[in-house]
């Protein structure tokens, strides 16, 4: 059976199957107990194929939310589903972490979020350590968030600027969310890690 929704706004609730991202910066995996809440302008759901397409979509669970112009979901309602969001994708968890992208592939395994692959020209992420206005910010052609490892990996002309004033570029960055550690990797045999620091005090006594 195929369902097409052309109302001004569709509101769907899928209980207890998958949990939306507990944060691009969360250290703990999300819980599967809370329902996913889907709002969209247009919804087309194929019960036979177990797929769905959405336009002007917002997907929320708890305090986490993904918004995009369109989305396609496979294995909708199962413990292992895959979502493809396209067009002005914004992934937010709380006041501390966000990802902006042109496209994001979101994978759930065993009822919880497993991985997000965000791409863009560029895709961007932001991580706040405290309630201050400053934040670590990064951009790359590809940003991968792995939930169990609590890591964000940046590839494709990545750049990072930290709340402490460091600006870096390298072939790849690995950002460890649990302890806030940042690792930069260069290609083998090259010196491609570039760091700029901006001292806040005077260098002259």
Stretches with model-predicted labels:
Residues 1-205:
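Mature-chain termini and adjacent capping regions
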